Amino acid sequence: TNGNREKITREETAALRNKTVGIVGLSVGSTTAVALAMERGCGALKLADFDVVELSNMNRIRCALHELELPKWVVTARAIAEFDPFLELEIFEDGVTTENMDVFVSGCDVLVDACDSLGVKAALRLEAKRQACPVVMDTNDRGMLDIERYDRPEWTLGGFLHGRIDEPTMKSFAQAKIWTREALQAFVNVAEASERGQRSLPKVGTELVSWPQTYTGVCAGGAHAAEACRRLALGEALPDARI
């Protein structure tokens, strides 16, 4: 809009029309999707999630009671269509799998990892590296944001997640069905989490069914991820780093 001119220039707006962002997971991912759509941080979104909205999701997904049991992608796509019916959406209603991962990543300028599954997180990065596509991940703890520059292999230290995980280990994670302490440490490093995060994160996969997420964290993380996506899509030299 005119009010955003110079924050986002005419030239950038024109360039962003030709950019595609792929988002895997539509809990915190839905906030990123809506933020990108609202400021037109891309011209197209690929959305992937097989799950439905449950009552337990309503602490972090902005939706109405009448949307319970609807697929998460429906809730997200509907929210976007209500303010921008012209944004191009491509839906992967069965989520991403080993069978469609290459198709999902193909054509994306940036990927957002917002899923809970260890196997999918790992497989997404293997494919992102193969197709040279950057990945953004918000951990929803003390504002932690990962920007992974697989489009700039000279920056990634030859591995994944800023050199934290080597390729054989990532391939083994891609076959995993549940989170292990080793995987959690590799992806997050619990010692770097907030005090309360250090208490809750180690319980993922045992006492907690998924990542602990508060709506304040989801809002902040979704916005930060959306801005990172826009800046990456515009070719800014954002570092391969955990912020």
Give a label for each model feature:
Residues 1-3, 231-243:
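Phosphate-binding loop/pocket of nucleotide- and phosphate-handling active sites
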Residues 1-21:
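N-terminal charged helix/coil linker that caps or initiates catalytic domains
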Residues 17-54:
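Glycine-rich adenosine-cofactor-binding loop
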Residues 32, 36, 76, 222-230:
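Buried hydrophobic packing segments
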Residues 47-84:
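Glycine-rich phosphate-binding loop and adjoining beta1-alpha1-beta2 segment
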Residues 73-109, 115-121:
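A structured beta-alpha segment of the ubiquitous adenosine-cofactor-binding alpha/beta core
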Residues 109-216:
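E1/E1-like adenylate-forming module used to activate ubiquitin-like modifiers
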Residues 154, 220-237:
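Oxidoreductase and adenylate-handling cofactor-binding alpha/beta cores
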